[in-house]
Design a protein with these regions (language model features):
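Walker A/P-loop phosphate-binding element recognition
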Residues: 358
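Core catalytic region of metal-dependent phosphoesterases/phosphodiesterases
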Residues: 69-164
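Metal-dependent phosphoesterase/phosphodiesterase active-site architecture
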Residues: 1-63, 71-90, 135-139, 145-147, ...
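Short, flexible/disordered intra-domain loops and linkers
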Residues: 62-68, 102-108, 152-158, 259-261, ...
């Protein structure tokens, strides 16, 4: 039984386009770029600056699950301590668990981060769709921000008496009466939700808030403390000579065609067997929560076992969703958001050809490279790696001649930030033979929800290349769940990064209070 439901890629794309009135005549007639924003800064194109990164943070604080450790509040405290002087915050997705519901925003987002919101001293008065940030806050959509809720309420309503109380009071699953409505809650919370405006007032709104120009393109003006909306689900901005590209990876994470095709294929049979095993594991954990929790409380901190079991159930659900995606993968063109990928290709090429740009940062939810135990092998991980690699190959082909003439060939991206995997990890790709070679990949997905372990297979990721297993990426730092029993460790993490005036522009500053062994500027 699946507790969550995810809309298809075409449904996600269409719904989000409607919400921002994508390419409405009022927008195109003004030659507005709906994928660009700008915010004012006193920094010059080569000045150093810092920014913060967090992700997978949206669990409840102070009640229900995690109420004893209050991870969201700890993250918020770190943000306040380390955020002084930061230019902006990047969020790698999954802002509100479990299903991105508008009902959960006050408890799972507004309360923990109220100090960064206008009127945050009275969080109860802040509506989730009326938030204004004091500091630039730039999120991307996570998978949980798109989820809906078809069966969970039926499950809970079918549980009676002490068992229902046990589930609700000890492991509060962070759900309300409905889900995200196909990402609508995120759109109302963070995007410029033009669909909700009267048609006759759209032009006035555009003339008031789309007043900036970047590379001769008219775009949204982001004003901290006044107007802090995003123009689209994927977008870009430039700060002190650094181009930041924020993607919606939920629309190009469909497992590759052929992975699940063929009713009698061995891979398909293996996945069916794995699915059955996962359902069995899930049933055992649900039983353990309901029937074995109270006796276990005599030997452990109250509720910790329930938290752990609920985290395992959530991980199993994500694995089940990934298997369903693999089994249903097809050859249809509508399973890939080609428009977004083409946009990224064109913007990267233009960025490299712009002498005013000194660095490039990419932000998305799903990590292309990761060694976290539940994510490294998933079809979605491999699909995002493939799609991003395909784009970077095209960019490399466009730029190759110019780079050869200049006698240099740098990585196409200075830094890639992601979440989804519940850990903090820094990887670097090697000579992959593609445009994604020699890039640092930072995963910041342990900012408040359950943490997970590194895979037992080790820190090196391999691919089959010309009949040989070749290492394509290696993990330089992994911080996640570790130990057992009294030695169990579940550190929450956020990341801070500082640019430097000399190339390469991005260097590690702090990582949740720790400094990586190697900075991103080193070869």
């Amino acid at each position: 039984m699946q507790l969550i439901q995810e809309p298809t890629i075409p449904v996600k794309m269409h719904a989000m386009q409607q919400r921002v009135c994508w390419q409405d005549p009022a927008i195109t007639s003004r030659q507005i770029d709906q994928t660009q924003l700008a915010f004012s800064s006193e920094l010059g194109p080569e000045d150093p600056f810092s920014f913060l990164v967090l992700g997978d943070s949206g669990t409840g604080s102070g009640t229900g699950r995690h109420r004893r450790r209050r991870p969201q509040c700890q993250v918020a405290k770190l943000l306040m301590e380390q955020g002084n002087g930061a230019s902006f915050v990047l969020h790698t997705g999954d802002l509100v668990y479990q299903v991105g519901s508008s009902e959960q925003y006050r408890r799972n987002f507004i309360r923990p981060y109220r100090d960064w919101l206008v009127g945050g001293d009275q969080p109860k008065r802040i509506a989730y769709d009326q938030m204004t940030f004091k500091l630039p806050f730039f999120p991307v959509l996570g998978n949980h921000d798109y989820y809906d809720l078809p069966l969970l309420l039926g499950l809970l309503s079918g549980i009676t008496g002490p068992l229902q109380w046990l589930l609700r009071s000890l492991i509060n699953l962070d759900v309300g009466w409905h889900g995200s409505h196909r990402g609508d809650a995120f759109a109302r919370a963070f995007l410029d939700y033009l669909k909700g405006r009267p048609k006759h007032s759209l032009g006035d709104h555009l003339d008031q808030h789309y007043t900036s120009r970047v590379d001769d393109r008219r775009c949204l003006t982001y004003r901290p403390g006044n107007f802090t909306r995003l123009p689209n689900r994927y977008y870009s901005f430039r700060h002190a000579g650094i181009d930041v590209f924020a993607l919606d990876s939920n629309t190009f994470n469909q497992p590759l065609p052929g992975q699940g095709s063929g009713k009698g294929g061995q891979k398909r049979q293996d996945w069916l067997a794995e699915r059955a095993e996962l359902h069995q594991q899930k049933a055992e954990r649900l039983k353990a929560i309901g029937l074995e929790l109270l006796p276990s409380l005599q030997n452990t901190e109250p509720g910790d076992r329930a938290d752990d079991l609920a985290g395992e159930i959530e991980a199993i659900d994500e694995q089940l969703l990934d298997i369903e995606k693999r089994l249903n993968s097809g050859d249809g063109a509508d399973s890939v958001d080609q428009e977004q990928l083409d946009w990224l290709r064109d913007r990267l090429v233009a960025s490299w050809r712009n002498p005013a740009v000194r660095g490039r940062v990419l932000v998305l939810h799903h990590p292309p490279y990761v060694t976290e135990a539940t994510k490294w092998f998933q079809g979605q991980t491999l699909a995002v790696r493939h799609q991003l690699r395909r784009v970077l190959d095209q960019v490399a082909a466009e730029l190759e001649e110019a780079q050869v003439q200049q006698g240099q060939k740098q990585p196409l991206l200075d830094l890639v930030l992601s979440g989804h995997a519940h850990c903090l990890e820094l990887l670097r790709s090697g000579d992959t033979g593609h445009g994604d070679a020699h890039i640092p990949w930072l995963i910041c997905g342990g900012s408040g929800y359950s943490l997970r372990r590194q895979r037992p297979e080790g820190a090196d990721l391999q691919e089959r290349i010309e009949a040989a297993d070749c290492t394509v990426a290696y993990s330089q730092l992994f911080i996640g769940r570790s130990g057992k029993g009294s030695s169990l460790r579940r550190p929450i993490r956020l990341c801070g990064w500082r640019s430097q005036p000399a190339a390469p522009p991005i260097h590690a500053s702090t990582v949740g209070g720790r400094t990586p062994a190697a900075s991103l500027g080193e070869p």
